[in-house]
Amino acid sequence: MKIDVLTLFPEMFQSPFEESIFKRATDNNLVRLEIHNFRDFAHDKHHAVDDSPYGGGAGMLLKPEPLFEAVEDVLREDPTPAPVILLSPQGRSFNQEVARELAKHERLIIICGHYEGFDERVREHLSTDEISIGDFVLTGGELAAMVVIDAVSRLIPGVLGSGESSQDDSHSNGLLEHPHYTRPPVFRGWGIPDVLLSGNHAQINRWRRKESLRRTLKRRPDMFEKIPLSKADRKLVDEILAEENTQG
């Protein structure tokens, strides 16, 4: 996958993507990241990319000309089709389902917002998608872009060392992950569930599924309501509710 990022602060992307999993992905040509400073496409003497809004009001807006020219230049260099994604608090909520959707593309073009936002013509005539990573305010879209890039890259075949790694992550199957334990078996008097030491893989898998259901039901009831439960899942949920009632 090729990912083009349009930003005013290209230096922000250097360190995070030169380490760990993403570096291996780029070294193995699984992901190609190209950063473009769209200030290079501002042609006045001050290289201004923003201006005050018509009708008045606080703040500045990103002008349409530099962004349109930047995207057009990127597509001229490489005409591979790609969704043009605005990172904006007005966008659809980013989640694992959206990450899977984006991972199916050969290429992404991501525009990082700043100031009070974009001239509306960018939204109407340039972008094809608009994404928000949450209901909070950031100084710019760079951190949001990093979140999207990281989440999407993990889903590209070959990026992770284990084929099961991304499938077992929280949210990948609609559930939060089950608890994990490693050595030592007892730490400061705190042990681990006996089933994990039993060697019985069927029982271990049952325990993991049950704890995923328990954790999702308790921490993310909104997610739990959307999960299609099998007959075995419903039995586990009944056990969980009975245990919770006993403890309560």
From Swiss-Prot:
Question: Does Signal count among this protein's keywords?
Answer: no
What InterPro entries does the database record attribute to this sequence? Alpha/beta_knot_MTases, tRNA_m1G_MeTrfase_C_sf, tRNA_m1G_MeTrfase_TrmD, tRNA_m1G_MTases_N, tRNA_MeTrfase_TRMD/TRM10
According to its UniProt record, where is this protein located?
Answer: Cytoplasm
GO molecular-function term, one example from the UniProt record: tRNA (guanine(37)-N1)-methyltransferase activity
Q: Where are the transmembrane segments?
A: none
What are the boundaries of the signal sequence? none
Q: Predominant location of this chain?
A: cytoplasm
- Listed SUPFAM superfamilies: alpha/beta knot
Q: Which domain of life is it from?
A: Bacteria
Keywords of the record, alphabetical order, are:
Cytoplasm, Methyltransferase, S-adenosyl-L-methionine, Transferase, tRNA processing
Annotated residues that bind S-adenosyl-L-methionine are located at G113, I133, G134, D135, F136, V137, L138
> What Pfam families is this protein classified in?
tRNA_m1G_MT (PF01746)
Reactions accelerated catalytically: guanosine(37) in tRNA + S-adenosyl-L-methionine = N(1)-methylguanosine(37) in tRNA + S-adenosyl-L-homocysteine + H(+)
| Gene Ontology biological process terms in this record | tRNA N1-guanine methylation
Q: Name one GO cellular component term.
A: cytosol
What are the EC numbers?
2.1.1.228
Please give the PANTHER family that the UniProt record associates with this protein: TRNA (GUANINE-N(1)-)-METHYLTRANSFERASE (PTHR46417:SF1)
Protein family per UniProt? Belongs to the RNA methyltransferase TrmD family.
Instruction: Please give the subunit comment from the record.
Output: Homodimer.
Function per UniProt:
Specifically methylates guanosine-37 in various tRNAs.
Query: What protein name applies here?
Result: tRNA (guanine-N(1)-)-methyltransferase
